[in-house]
């Protein structure tokens, strides 16, 4: 029996929507990364973009465990000498673009390279509950119901 290898023309992509309200960030990001890569499918092929299109809503209501809300730091460099900058997760979540916390968590769980960048383009994250993808008829997934540790009630 030969190993199955899916061709890019055989890929069938679905649209799924996940409500991130009160979900633990890392657990949500791991679930979304697996969906984007297509690892949940029996037809998974490592070199083919086989994942689904994922919409995450209510990203501003994400939950972080422990003291990560105040202590977790996101670093970046401006390109100038001594230009290292940082912001805490709290500053980002209370700032203009709170969805970036979820985007960064998922981005760092996907392999770096051309295929990873293509798979990451299938992720859409929105801070509120509104999204412009109703025409795609996304299937709702309840990540909180999969495991009791996925949801944080505090």
UniProtKB/Swiss-Prot annotation:
GO terms under biological process: negative regulation of translation; translation
Signal peptide (UniProt feature, chain positions): none
One GO MF term attached to the UniProt entry: mRNA binding
Superkingdom of the organism of origin: Bacteria
Gene Ontology cellular component terms for the protein in this record: cytosolic large ribosomal subunit
CDD domains in the cross-refs: Ribosomal_L13
InterPro entries listed in its UniProt record: Ribosomal_uL13, Ribosomal_uL13_bac-type, Ribosomal_uL13_sf
Keyword Ribosomal protein: yes
Function: This protein is one of the early assembly proteins of the 50S ribosomal subunit, although it is not seen to bind rRNA by itself. It is important during the early stages of 50S assembly.
PANTHER family: LARGE RIBOSOMAL SUBUNIT PROTEIN UL13M, RIBOSOMAL PROTEIN L13
Family indicated by similarity: Belongs to the universal ribosomal protein uL13 family.
Subunit architecture: Part of the 50S ribosomal subunit.
Listed name of the protein: Large ribosomal subunit protein uL13
Record organism: Bartonella henselae (strain ATCC 49882 / DSM 28221 / CCUG 30454 / Houston 1) (Rochalimaea henselae)
Biological classification of the source: Bacteria, Pseudomonadati, Pseudomonadota, Alphaproteobacteria, Hyphomicrobiales
């Amino acid at each position: 029996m030969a190993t199955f290898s899916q061709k890019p023309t055989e890929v069938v992509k679905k649209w799924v929507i996940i409500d991130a309200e009160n979900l633990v960030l890392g657990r949500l990001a791991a679930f979304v990364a697996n969906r984007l890569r297509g690892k949940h499918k029996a037809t998974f092929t490592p070199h083919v973009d086989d994942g689904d299109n994922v919409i995450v809503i209510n990203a501003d209501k994400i939950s972080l465990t422990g003291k990560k809300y105040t202590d977790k730091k996101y670093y970046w460099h401006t390109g100038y000498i001594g230009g290292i900058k940082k912001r805490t997760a709290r500053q980002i979540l209370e700032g203009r673009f709170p969805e970036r916390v979820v985007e960064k968590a998922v981005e760092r769980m996907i392999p770096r390279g051309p295929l990873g960048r293509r798979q990451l383009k299938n992720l859409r994250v929105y801070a509120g509950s509104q999204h412009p993808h109703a025409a795609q008829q996304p299937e709702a997934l309840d990540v909180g119901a999969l495991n009791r540790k996925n949801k944080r009630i505090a």
